[in-house]
Amino acid sequence: MAKLIVSDVDVKDKKVLVRVDFNVPIKDGVIGDDNRIVAALPTIKYIIENGGKAILLSHLGRIKSDEDKKSLSLAPVAKRLGELLEKPVTFVPSNEGKEVEDAINNMKDGDVVVLENTRFQDIDNDFGKRESKNDPKLGEYWASLGDVFVNDAFGTAHRSHASNVGIATAMKAAGKPVAAGFLLEKEIKFLGNAVANPVHPFVTILGGAKVSDKIGVITNLIPKADHIIIGGGMAYTFLKAQGHNIGKSLVEDDKVEFAKELLEKAGDKLVLPIDHVAATEFNNDAASEVVGQDIPDNEMGLDIGPKTIELFKKTLEGAKTVVWNGPMGVFEMPNFAKGTLEVGRALADLPDATTIVGGGDSTAAAKQLGIAPKLTHISTGGGASLEYLEGKELPGIACVSDK
């Protein structure tokens, strides 16, 4: 069933609550990467250009003490949003009470207000984690502030919080519309369709350190994907399951048996490294060498080797849908980043393919290579992307009204 989108709703003269994902890196009040703010602009602009009042809610970081509040205020985010929109944005240093209500009542059509970090509610008022535990009273309070609710925060769609599910539940009970923003719509369209209804050949590239993080994804995708490329630290658990020597490489010994089962279930769908860049130490400056599929006892694999790069490129040839999540090696060390970067290049060069990238290192590689414009979609969710790829229903999407 298709979801209600913000463009399906009349926002003129309406107070529109928007759950955005402004969880950006901030150090000493300076925003390190404003991509998540930029990603929310289409939804915000649509609301204000069509005569609505945009009231924005977001979390930022994890709040465990009053000390955290000093460094995790959304004030710098509101300032940056104003610069990007080229118009004044009102920041309210609270998210409940008279100050909030007065600011909203003073809004004119086309105005934008940013409320303080929703997770401040996790330590305020001695009520326990009101935001993170989805206190229904908090959801009802926030819902009372608006006429329409738009969820545009895919990054928290796998969480059931007061600021997404809580507001949506209360809005629906009051007969008010609950819609997806354009960013959430894009995630549903590309990531959701890639899993539910991919154009074949469908290839998934999975990397990162742990098999345990990707078990659900692999299990869900075995029947759907034509090939599942496995790189990064998680590959060594599979190689050990095949009987290869992996030296001092990262391995999850308690997952070796499970890896064996997956190998049997997947048959030749799983594509594993056939050579490695190995070193004796986990260090960017460590002397390294290319070794075959078996790694010497005193060395550890830190990146895929040149033959593996060619094998993975060949596996990608002709693919029509590709989902990439996770690096092929220790991407944060420049000397062991080549495998990840080469896979990114191969992805960008695929003709007529839907290419979807998720996960921090894969996204960083895409940006480093400057290939982002050539990719169909870069997902804004970490854990949410993985759970979506596992085929799970995400609370932040399920709570949006159907058309």
From Swiss-Prot:
The keyword Transferase applies. One of its GO terms (molecular function) is ADP binding. GO terms for cellular component: cytosol. Keywords: ATP-binding, Cytoplasm, Glycolysis, Kinase, Nucleotide-binding, Transferase. GO terms for biological process: gluconeogenesis; glycolytic process. It catalyses: (2R)-3-phosphoglycerate + ATP = (2R)-3-phospho-glyceroyl phosphate + ADP. ATP binds at K214, G301, E332, G359, G360, D361, S362. Pfam families: PGK. It is an enzyme of class 2 (transferase). It is found in: Cytoplasm. InterPro entries: Phosphoglycerate_kinase (IPR001576), Phosphoglycerate_kinase_CS (IPR015911), Phosphoglycerate_kinase_N (IPR015824), Phosphoglycerate_kinase_sf (IPR036043). Pathway: Carbohydrate degradation; glycolysis; pyruvate from D-glyceraldehyde 3-phosphate: step 2/5. The keyword Cytoplasm applies. It comes from the Bacteria. Substrate binds at D21, F22, N23, R36, H59, L60, G61, R62, R119, R159. Its EC number is 2.7.2.3. Monomer. Belongs to the phosphoglycerate kinase family. This is Phosphoglycerate kinase. It comes from Lactobacillus delbrueckii subsp. lactis.
